[in-house]
Structure formats: structure tokens, C-alpha cells
């Protein structure tokens, strides 16, 4: 099991370019199954989850060519549908939560699919109902194979329909869109997720010949077409990594510039950090975080404690709350972090408490952080990364701590962050990877 050894207290300086967006990459790579023609995707992040999905598509028969460090072409002309019944497919797909998004394009184009119960972060209940109910409404049948812990899906003649999603699930919306673009007739999806990565998926599909209207809204109308063609697609920068870099700069009292952030697609992220007292400025399409010796959490106008909570787009992504929680430990003032979507994502705070942070875990969804200001330094610690987002939060905490910390199980961090140790070290950090 690999580990990071982090020497805390090093100031960062310089420029950094964010990786391509993990969540968009998983969606658009799955979408390449919808066409037999060549599709080129640029700015694909070199991370475990994405690389595992690429390997899985290759095993399915997709011809994949690496064109550059972060560019690939995909040609899904001949797919081995029998491979879905193999133990190899079940094993690989069960360890990758993004594999659930194979269902939409496979049923849409081939009329059948198999998906093992997918893995991913252990951050509480993450139901698949939205995916399955939406695709069922298009005419697919789902049968659960208890022996193999897999779903067998049949849907030879999908037909468009109206559907109201009971939650604005991002991956659920993506899956339904990919199933609907080749269905007969018109599909209307109300309460659809509308975050930038869904917008990107829709734009890519339209460039392939799909007919999707209402992009960037929660009401999508999809007129089915008979076939889709090739295209060239550029993945957006990863908003979660951008937020992570802001957190690193804040907790290490550093000045850094984050380049080419696609600022208009960051939503509430910059303002949420400003609520914690973090200064940041926008120049062209770059974010500049100046060196701050201290920062103070804002209060509401009536003087009550600030609450920062996740919400569907354009609200704050739940993936950044762990980072914001760590940043708040060094602030002046108090804040309530409310993680609405997942009930186990705050359980890593016990590790921060061991490092000296003042945190009250109110319940599985809420934590109050009492910032102790610049005079306070976290203590170094030995810990293990429980998931991607808690892992990067613990890494940020270790960078701001006194002494040398060790984080085990860093495969969790590698699942979502590209060569993060090397990139931080180029800014002045001191992180050693131990295999």
C-alpha cells in the first residue's frame, strides 16, 4: 500500500494548471460507445478512475489510441457483448463507480447491458434508483442477478417519454441522456442535473448529431436520432481540484496562481471560500490567491454563525466540503459545515481532531468548526485516506501542520488527482511517495 510522507510548513509559490475534470471525463468516455466512428477527447486526466474506465472499454473491444499525454481517440465499431457476462468484467466494473454510466449508452445503442454493483468511495448510501427508473421509463427491463451481484438490462426498442426525476442526480441524468439520444421519439427530463459537466456531455452529443435542447437548465428535451457520429471534444478543468488548490494556498499562507480555470463554470466555489475569509482575484481566466497571514470567517448579518452547505448546481459541490472544513480549522471564527448529500463523508474529522483541530461532529451530516486563527498549528499525524475527497483534505491539513505526517492508502487520492505529489512539490511543497 502506497503512502505520502508530508513535511508541513512549506510555503507554496508559482503557477499551476488544473487537470481535466474527472467527473466529466467519466461521462464523455462512456458516451464514446454511442457511435461506431472515431471520437477524440482532449484534456483527459491521468488518474486511476479514468484509466481504469479506459482499460475496461478496451477490454470491451473499443479501439483506443493515446494521442498525447492527455488526449485519446476512441472507436467503438465492434463491441464484444459476450464480455459483459465474464467474471473479468464483473470484477473490474464492480470496483469502479463510473461503470454504472455504461448502462445508458449500451442499452441505447445495443439494446442490452450488464453492470455489476459499482464501487467507488465509501461515503454513505449512494442509490442508483434515478439511473434505473429513468432508463426503465424509456422501456428497458432490469433483472438483478443475486448470484453475480449484477444487473442484467434489456431494452431493444427504447421510446422517448416524459419523466420527473426525484433527485437531480448528475450521473443519473448523464445515464438517462445517453440512453435517450438514440431512442425513438422525444424524451423530456424535468429536474435534470445541469452542472457544467452535464452541459459538456450534451454539447458533445449534439456535435455527434444528437438533438438536445434546454442545455444548462433543469428541463432537457431530447429528440431521438437513428445514429451518432464522431467528434472532437475538450474536457473542462476540474473545479474540485481548483478548489483544492485554493485550500492549499490558504492553509500554507501562500501566493499561487491557478491558470485557465474556466471561471464561469466554477459556480459558488469562489464565493464559498470568500465566506471563510480567503482572498482571491480573477485575472483573465486565472485565479490569484495572495499570501494571507490570517483570515476571518464571515458571519450572517444578524451575527449568527455562518453555514456552508452543499446543494445541486449552481450550489456548492459536496466534493469540496471536506477541503473547506480543513481550511476553516485555521481561520478566525466558527462555521457550520452541512453535508446534505452523503451521511458518512464527515467521519474523517476524527483525524483532524487528533491533529488538534477544534471540531464538533453534530451528527453524520453536520460539523461545527471553531477556528483557532493563525496562532494555531495542526500537529503532524499518521493517518489513512478513507476516500478521494477526505484524502485530499487530509493532505492539505498535513501541508499546514507542524512536523512530518504520513498518509496511507493514497490510491484513494490517486483515483481523483493527477500526480498530485509531483505538482505540489514543483510549487515548493515537500511530499514523498513511498511504495
Q: Would you name each region that the model predicts?
A:
Residues 1-435:
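Short, structured segments at the rim of ligand-binding sites
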Amino acid at each position: 500500500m502506497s503512502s505520502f510522507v508530508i513535511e508541513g510548513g512549506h510555503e507554496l509559490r508559482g503557477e499551476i494548471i488544473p487537470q481535466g475534470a474527472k467527473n466529466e471525463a467519466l461521462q464523455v468516455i462512456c458516451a464514446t460507445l454511442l457511435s461506431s466512428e472515431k471520437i477524440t477527447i482532449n484534456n483527459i486526466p491521468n488518474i486511476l478512475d479514468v484509466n481504469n474506465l479506459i482499460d475496461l472499454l478496451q477490454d470491451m473491444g473499443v479501439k483506443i489510441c493515446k494521442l498525447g499525454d492527455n488526449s485519446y481517440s476512441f472507436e467503438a465499431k465492434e463491441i464484444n457483448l459476450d464480455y459483459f457476462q465474464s467474471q473479468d468484467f464483473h470484477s473490474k466494473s464492480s470496483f469502479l463507480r463510473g461503470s454504472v454510466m455504461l448502462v445508458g449508452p449500451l442499452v441505447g445503442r445495443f439494446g442490452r447491458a450488464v453492470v455489476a454493483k459499482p464501487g467507488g468511495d465509501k461515503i454513505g448510501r449512494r442509490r442508483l434508483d434515478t439511473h434505473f427508473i429513468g432508463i426503465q421509463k424509456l422501456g428497458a427491463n432490469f433483472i438483478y442477478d443475486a448470484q453475480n451481484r449484477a444487473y442484467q438490462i434489456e431494452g431493444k426498442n427504447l421510446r422517448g417519454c416524459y419523466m420527473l426525476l426525484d433527485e437531480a442526480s448528475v450521473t443519473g441524468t448523464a445515464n438517462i441522456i445517453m440512453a435517450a439520444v438514440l431512442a425513438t421519439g422525444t424524451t423530456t427530463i424535468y429536474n435534470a442535473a445541469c452542472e457544467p459537466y452535464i452541459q459538456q456531455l450534451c454539447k458533445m452529443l449534439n456535435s455527434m448529431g444528437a438533438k438536445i435542447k434546454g442545455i444548462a437548465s433543469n428541463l432537457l428535451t431530447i429528440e431521438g436520432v437513428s445514429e451518432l457520429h464522431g467528434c472532437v471534444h475538450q474536457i473542462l478543468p476540474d473545479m474540485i481540484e481548483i478548489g483544492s488548490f485554493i485550500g492549499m494556498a490558504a492553509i500554507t499562507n501562500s501566493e499561487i496562481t491557478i491558470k485557465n480555470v474556466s471561471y464561469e463554470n466554477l459556480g459558488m466555489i469562489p464565493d464559498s471560500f470568500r465566506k471563510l475569509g480567503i482572498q482571491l482575484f480573477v485575472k483573465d481566466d486565472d485565479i490569484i490567491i495572495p499570501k494571507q497571514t490570517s483570515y476571518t470567517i464571515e458571519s450572517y448579518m444578524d451575527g449568527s454563525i455562518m453555514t456552508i452547505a452543499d446543494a445541486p448546481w449552481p450550489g456548492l459541490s459536496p466534493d469540496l466540503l471536506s477541503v473547506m472544513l480543513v481550511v476553516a480549522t485555521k481561520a478566525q471564527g466558527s462555521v457550520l459545515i452541512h453535508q446534505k448529500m452523503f451521511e458518512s463523508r464527515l467521519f474523517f474529522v476524527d483525524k483532524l481532531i487528533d491533529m488538534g483541530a477544534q471540531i464538533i461532529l453534530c451528527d453524520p451530516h453536520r460539523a461545527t468548526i471553531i477556528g483557532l486563527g493563525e496562532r494555531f498549528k495542526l500537529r503532524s499525524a499518521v493517518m489513512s485516506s478513507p476516500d478521494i475527497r477526505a484524502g485530499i483534505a487530509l493532505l492539505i491539513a498535513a501541508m499546514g501542520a507542524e512536523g512530518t505526517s504520513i498518509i496511507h492508502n493514497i490510491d484513494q487520492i490517486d483515483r481523483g488527482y493527477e500526480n498530485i505529489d509531483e505538482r505540489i512539490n514543483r510549487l515548493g511543497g515537500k511530499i514523498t511517495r513511498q511504495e
